[in-house]
UniProtKB/Swiss-Prot annotation:
GO cellular component: mitochondrial inner membrane
Protein name in UniProt: Iron-sulfur clusters transporter atm1, mitochondrial
Principal location class: mitochondrion
Domain ABC transmembrane type-1 residue range list: 128-418
Residues annotated for glutathione binding in this entry: R297, T298, K299, F300, R301, N360, S361, G362, Q363, G410
Enzyme Commission identifier(s): 7.-.-.-
InterPro entries: AAA+_ATPase, ABC1_TM_dom, ABC1_TM_sf, ABC_transporter-like_ATP-bd, ABC_transporter-like_CS, P-loop_NTPase, Type_1_exporter
Amino acid sequence: MLRQAAQTRCWRTPARFVSHRPAFPRSNPVSAALGGTQFRKLSVKTQTDKNTLSDKKTAEADTSSSSSSAKSAAPSQQKTQNATTAQKNLLSESTVANKEQRKADWAIMREMAKYLWPKGDWGTKLRVGTALSLLVGAKVLNVEVPFYFKSIVDSMNVDFAAVGGTAYTVAGSMIIAYGATRIGATFFQELRNAVFASVAQKAIRKVARNVFEHLLRLDLNFHLSRQTGGLTRAIDRGTKGISFLLTSMVFHVVPTALEISLVCGILTHQYGIKFAAITATTMLAYSAFTIATTAWRTKFRKQANAADNRGATVAVDSLINYEAVKYFNNEKFEVARYDKALKAYEDASIKVTTSLAFLNSGQNMIFSSALAAMMYLAADGVATGSLTVGDLVMVNQLVFQLSVPLNFLGSVYRELRQSLLDMETLFNLQKVNVNIKEKPDAKPLELKQGGQIRFENVTFGYHPERPILKNASFTIPAGQKFAIVGPSGCGKSTILRLLFRYYDVQEGRILVDGQDIRHVTIESLRKAIGVVPQDTPLFNDTIEHNIRYGRLDASDEEVRKAARRAHIHELVERLPEGYRTAVGERGMMISGGEKQRLAISRLLLKDPQLLFFDEATSALDTYTEQALMQNINSILKEKGRTSVFVAHRLRTIYDCDQILVLKDGQVAELGSHRELLDLDGIYAELWSAQETSLAQDPEYERNAGLEGETAGEVEDKAPRQ
């Protein structure tokens, strides 16, 4: 059986076949093949070095020594670790000193001021100017209301029978003016809100778009270590805080100061320094108490925000991994995790509410004391004859007129502090450094040689203490089918990530058709590369959308042609909704094999010059895999594309022009399938181990028969010479 299995004919292209040498069993073949190498799970946690070190070493890549590279990479990697730690703490809402917090708050307010008065945007400036004019008009009318009220009261303090008048003849004009003034103030205020609405919404849109755009520019490491639920919740709170901050800056802080100044001036001019002194003292005491108490309350709000982020993270994580929760019956565990986060939020929210009650009580006590003192002075003036009853009413009205902006200012300050806290995370996201950057003089990638890829003395590691690639050098010839094999954690997928510039090398350089990838534009580089990754990323949308994502301007016919080449068109057509069928969150409504074929069709639609298949057919059955690979091989041969296959199952890649064997981050072997078998090294050991395992599999005979039938069909269809 073993000899028969080893001699089974396999295909390479429709007209080319090879026979494998017999796979003789050896003692402990797996451990012998790996040479005791420990299988390691790829764990991406830290960010690689920036471009500086790589650029410095480009010219001397071939002569770089391991000792110098270790010394050079250490500071960079330490800096990267610190940056990663900062990223992890991004949503922690840690408490900072008041001085630092005020500095951060002012920075946010300065940033938001740019959206209030943007350069060159005269439409926004006109709206802000109009809103401010309406604001001033509304405040002036508000201050006039007590004057009319005083006149009405004083004019009514007569003997109507003696003068023979009516309310209209005595105070009619004042009553009309009173009503008109209040209506005018309200009209100006509402018109102001309508005029300013587009300014606030436009600012929210710009900030949210900038943050989203920046998140898409951040490196892979940030997105691998992010907390999706907490991140989205922080962004949501931050965008809501923008509207309040802009409104408070224009309509609350400035107008309240204006109204207080007007009232103090009127009281001083009309009633003397005592009234103005009480008013000024009240303002100072009220403001000082509000600021001090709110600063004390800030830590409770930060604790609540952090707990809210944790709760959102737990909820989203559990729902995304719904199947895993069900597989292991861990519903109660997930509910307990979520409840723990909710309990932390509950405790923090109780502190926020109780501290708010203390703040409101103190504010009310200060204002009520001032009101009582001013009413006493006014009543004393009426008793001595220096003031009229209308003056008493006017003082009362003016003080109450102040109560509205004062109480509003207190609540505004509280909400402003909360908005600033909510926006802090939003703006901190924009400050996260983009480590993978283009050079100012970067040029588009030009594929003049067909897409040759060359790694020269490349050293790279996600952790300083564990390099993944160590001085690796190899060339992927243009237009050839190339494979990379090796044990888990040896750097197979890392090669793709480095070529795609998810990370930059720490030593050495990577060339595509003789061009250092750090010297070309990122967009042109990534446009030339197509990838089918291990975990197929799909959007919660239709099958058609997920295929067309490879090239958004593709026609319906082009989408279906790509699906046919990926052997999924017939399956899609049998679905009730066809190409309009939704795939669900992360494609969970379709099988793993269907997801992989969708990913392949998306890649074929993109039609790049360089193609990477990272375990692209691992979820397919043998027959479907062979039929699909025949199609892919014919496309690669027809268009002369450079292709790289990363695989653990050697039967899927033995027909490649060259096979690279990685071990411990270094190139261990390189050659064709037959050359590597003749070498009798690591590849031969792996091949022997897998063939032995297949021969002992009860399903092997059936699969071998399918392979033979497929090979026979292809041979029959092959052109005869």
